[in-house]
């Protein structure tokens, strides 16, 4: 796709697409401040917080990116019944994201990542999370929500897996098989080396390390050695297209019939890489 074609797709075609994002929803919180002294209580810096920012994270960030492009985005997952859930709801409302598939659970907390920033330096990250599969009473709720979306008409599904429990083997396979029956493409943002649960998906977007682990081979980050591992991973798990991110080398796509395409990267100075993989 040439630059002009890509621009036309982003401005005209994508705006009417209905995309469901299923996965691990998170809240990212940033505490920005200045560090000018060491605490008298312990040998640690004191951060004088000046500003707090909350943003959608994990699968929620994927939905936010889609909404920003003009898609009708639907989010499915599970959060706690807590104040951080309310922050997420407010941001979903503002972004125009449908969160009717976001289960509110009294048995877990909303996954939250708190980052402490001094000037432009991230000093510390605090994670608040309880990892666990969907509860027996939650799975039917997710299935019913997804079935209604299929009946209404979906253009695509994204499974955003952060290994927090929503994207279990059985649930991923049910989503993929149902989507295949409706001829709805499925894109996977994977976690870990066990890709069997993603079998039958249309696209998967690992980084180079994840792809090598899934294929059981380590290769240098160069075009020639990367392509065969692409092909092997794709065929091993029955995934139609593999799009691997390669840091400063850009991205490489390998699809059916040995189709391949490389997109180089543009170097930029980055202070916070969180959310970069979701954006891909």
Label for each model-derived stretch:
Residues 1-36:
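Positively charged, low-complexity intrinsically disordered leader regions
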Residues 2-10, 40, 44-112:
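Substrate-binding N-lobe of the ribokinase-like
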Residues 20-22, 125, 155-158, 187, ...:
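Structural motif
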Residues 50-54, 264-275:
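Short pre-catalytic strand/loop immediately N-terminal to key active-site residues, enriched for Gly-Thr
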Residues 66, 273-280:
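Short, small-residue alpha-helix embedded
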Residues 100-108, 115-152:
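Conserved phosphate-binding/catalytic loop of the ribokinase/pfkB sugar-kinase fold
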Residues 150-166:
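Short acidic, glycine-rich surface-loop motifs adjacent to enzyme active sites
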Residues 164-260:
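Conserved phosphate/ATP/ADP-binding segment of small-molecule kinases
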């Amino acid at each position: 796709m040439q630059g002009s074609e890509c621009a036309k797709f982003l401005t005209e075609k994508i705006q009417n697409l209905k995309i469901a994002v299923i996965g691990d929803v998170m809240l990212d919180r940033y505490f920005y401040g200045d560090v000018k002294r060491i605490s008298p209580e312990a040998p640690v810096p004191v951060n004088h917080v000046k500003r707090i920012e909350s943003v959608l994270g994990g699968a929620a960030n994927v939905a936010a990116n889609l909404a920003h492009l003009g898609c009708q985005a639907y989010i499915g997952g599970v959060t706690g019944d807590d104040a951080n859930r309310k922050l997420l709801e407010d941001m979903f409302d503002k972004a125009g994201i449908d969160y009717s598939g976001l289960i509110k659970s009294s048995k877990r907390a909303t996954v939250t990542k708190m980052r402490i920033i001094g000037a432009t330096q991230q000093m510390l990250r605090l994670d608040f999370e309880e990892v666990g599969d969907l509860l027996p009473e939650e799975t039917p709720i997710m299935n019913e929500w997804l079935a209604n979306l299929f009946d209404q008409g979906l253009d695509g599904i994204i499974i955003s897996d952060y290994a927090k429990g929503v994207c279990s083997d059985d649930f991923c396979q049910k989503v993929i098989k149902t989507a295949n029956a409706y001829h709805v493409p499925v894109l996977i943002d994977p976690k870990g080396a066990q890709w069997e649960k993603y079998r039958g998906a249309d696209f998967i977007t690992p980084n180079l390390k994840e792809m090598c682990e899934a294929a059981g081979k380590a290769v240098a980050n160069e075009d020639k050695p990367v392509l065969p591992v692409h092909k092997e991973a794709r065929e091993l798990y029955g995934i139609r297209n593999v799009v691997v991110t390669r840091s400063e080398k850009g991205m490489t796509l390998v699809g059916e019939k040995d189709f391949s395409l490389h997109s180089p990267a543009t170097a930029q100075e980055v202070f916070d890489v969180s959310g970069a993989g979701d954006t891909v």
